[in-house]
């Protein structure tokens, strides 16, 4: 057989690994550890797509490489299995979401195993397993005990027809719900919040210690959004009312000509004049129909209403009209802004729209034409005139503090984490509300608080989750006869994924989240690989929970993930017509190398695009494994380009990877393998070991595979192959194409044992040194010959070789040699006349 029969070989080795528990996590305390973590998937009904294996293959290569280097390797997999699609499916079909989830997990697991990943399945976790979410609930009770979990009235996106609140992302730009197209209103509701803001400074500062890309760190820094500025208090004219504004530029206070409150601000009703009351009520209603995203869109037309009231500018006593406008959010900052239209574009547009005064306080622009947003010396600012930004801020803050109407303030863009969902399919929040007005956490001895099985998971209609319908579960009575009601909100999907990497370390512990000694042994995670779409929320939430558990003494490290790597996206092929509209692949035919719309006959342009069901360009790994084999898929996805690049899927590229594996198979199975080394491949082999080792370490898998190809080409030029080089090469390719490597190892090593723990090959530095080098021979300063000579020859030897060369002889024939200058390892210069 001169080709690699994947249909026979791959299932054979997958069966072997499962039967022998080949990838069970090592526990030898004398060995170093390596914890390779994948972002665990949500097991959707669609199954794996070819984007999933890219990250999984990367961690698998590292895990196999580290095992061969003698490390204890922890390489686990699990399921982030709570989520809306399962609940939606259950509502549509009347089936239990747990059954749907279980079927999906079985399918995902089958697909993952077919790709030959070296997971330790004894450590599998599932966020919907009560034995798992017992500890998710336990963490919540600890947050509650420490005052970091609290209830608050929060405006939510309420959809009356759906009987539930929806996330900002589920609100369409026209203010209707994504599902059903129903009206969405902003309505205050009781919600659970987690006080992530208490950790803002630590979440910010500790980023410096992490081996993460600067772009991801910057995304987190921006999300946390630390600002140093001042709180300024404005009195409302003719009343005892006042309100506070946070500003990063208190030095521009002399240019503040009006103030804007969020329509929901608590002062609005109290300060609105009777003449403006109707307009204000109407505007507040309109604002409640919009999502936060729509309200803060910079491109939208500025709208607002004057309340009829005035604020007093604390530095110059001038009256400033108080407006309400939907671009100011009650949930952000203090819900009030001081407007400096000369130096802020949004304020400038608002001032122009409503004919409000614009006062320049920083020189350098023409504020009648546009806002000047650069820095400049202060003007029209009394005691700040002529000062730069830094000095002016210091002076104005001192003045405000002296007057008692302001002080320096550090704020964060980060908001507390809205932690409750009005859904059924999530972890029950372990809190009981008693009729005497108190609330208590469910005691640890009663955890897990198990999600009750029910067919009735329609929304309750009251804004509570479907759990409010389940009276038997809902109502409880204390020993003293006091009646209570369980919390009906469930946790968001983020909860289970905020700590799953800890449970992998000790997944079957019934007494605690995980054993302290095991946590000390394995933390932090050495490499975490996943998509950049989780750069902010998931990673921030996991870091927050980890720091909280560190404060409790549960975990020994301040940070969970030492190194983070985001793989790129695998794009599908798309087709566009002359208008730029996308055409589904099943409506396209290829003729003479061009692409045409089957129905219209129009020639189409081919371009990469994100894989999607609507474009029918999703590639299923099952089809690839069936046709080409898992090893081909693994090698192709690693060879496509740099791991962090987004690259289009290509059948031609897949075929190229398959041909390479067939060449490897033929090289090892058909070449004569000898016990003696003739030295012909010394340099090529040692270069390959060195390059592949270094490139795996630095996650440059595409260049590692390119080097393996270089060796195959070199080896194919020889008649025979030295057995140690054959073995070493098989070991080098094993992390990339493990099934093929196992099969070839059996033949060459004459063993029935797995290659997985065979010591990684080493290289001989002396074999990398060139024995010969090229020198140039110059005559009268012009290069006349290039010669391969032994390295480090003496001047005399070089001169002798150069003068004996036929080409040189012909050039100097009949001429007198004046002198010969020889520079070892470089050149020979012959001067003639």
From Swiss-Prot:
Its main location: cytoplasm. InterPro entries: aa-tRNA-synth_I_CS, aa-tRNA-synth_Ia, Leu-tRNA-ligase, Leu_tRNA-synth_edit, M/V/L/I-tRNA-synth_anticd-bd, Methionyl/Leucyl_tRNA_Synth, Rossmann-like_a/b/a_fold, tRNAsynth_Ia_anticodon-bd. It is an enzyme of class 6 (ligase). A motif ('HIGH' region) lies at residues 41-52. A motif ('KMSKS' region) lies at residues 610-614. GO terms for biological process: leucyl-tRNA aminoacylation. It catalyses: tRNA(Leu) + L-leucine + ATP = L-leucyl-tRNA(Leu) + AMP + diphosphate. Gene3D superfamilies: HUPs (3.40.50.620), Isoleucyl-tRNA Synthetase, Domain 1 (1.10.730.10), Valyl/Leucyl/Isoleucyl-tRNA synthetase, editing domain (3.90.740.10). Disulfide bonds: none annotated. Its EC number is 6.1.1.4. Keywords: Aminoacyl-tRNA synthetase, ATP-binding, Cytoplasm, Ligase, Nucleotide-binding, Protein biosynthesis. Pfam families: Anticodon_1, tRNA-synt_1, tRNA-synt_1_2, tRNA-synt_1g. It is found in: Cytoplasm. ATP binds at residue 613. One of its GO terms (cellular component) is cytosol. Belongs to the class-I aminoacyl-tRNA synthetase family. This is Leucine--tRNA ligase. It comes from Streptococcus pneumoniae (strain CGSP14).
